[in-house]
Amino acid sequence: MSEGIDIKELKRRMDGAVSAFKSDIASLRTGRASANILDPVTIEAYGSRVPLNQVANITVPEPRMLTVSVWDKSMVSAVERGIRESNLGLNPIVDGQSLRIPLPELNEERRKSLVKVAHDYAEKSKVAIRHVRRDGMDGLKKAEKDGVIGQDESRAQSERVQKMTDETISEIDRLLGEKEKEIMQV
């Protein structure tokens, strides 16, 4: 087979968009506690902003409770402040060198707004996947124009790129559907 584009590289980039989407939706709060909920939280520590998981250990002792064990006692108030200011709607309770974070029930309005955020993440990922497809198609057109591959080979590879794109976007839609169900579950 003639050289046109690196299909494996396109697949790797599309899979990267799916991984980023999985990471994004994992941080969305559902009815159950998950340490990923606190992924977006950053703390003012040692002169810079660092992710919470670099200054504390996060555990899930109960379905509606998170526990954050801060490694450095002097950081407890900074961790509490970071969680309160994170716009996650969480109110940590300081308990010595750790914080307990009860997760309130999600009301219908909050659930719908979380679903909307999940849809935004999905759309962002689909756009990234389409950019990868466009890069691949542009590469094929250039290779065909430069005489590196023939028209038939270009068409065959272009169909493979489109099929790969469709499958990857279907995967995003499937993951979105699962997350939506999880969020709306009461």
UniProtKB/Swiss-Prot annotation:
Residue segments, region Disordered: 144-163
Alphabetic keyword roster: Cytoplasm, Protein biosynthesis
Cytoplasm listed as a keyword: yes
Domain of life according to the entry: Bacteria
GO molecular function: ribosomal large subunit binding
Keyword tRNA-binding: no
GO biological process, one term: cytoplasmic translational termination
GO cellular component: cytosol
First-listed, main subcellular location of the protein, grouped into a coarse class: cytoplasm
Location within or outside the cell: Cytoplasm
Family to which this protein belongs: Belongs to the RRF family.
Function: Responsible for the release of ribosomes from messenger RNA at the termination of protein biosynthesis. May increase the efficiency of translation by recycling ribosomes from one round of translation to another.
Protein's recorded name: Ribosome-recycling factor
Organism, scientific name: Rhizobium etli (strain ATCC 51251 / DSM 11541 / JCM 21823 / NBRC 15573 / CFN 42)
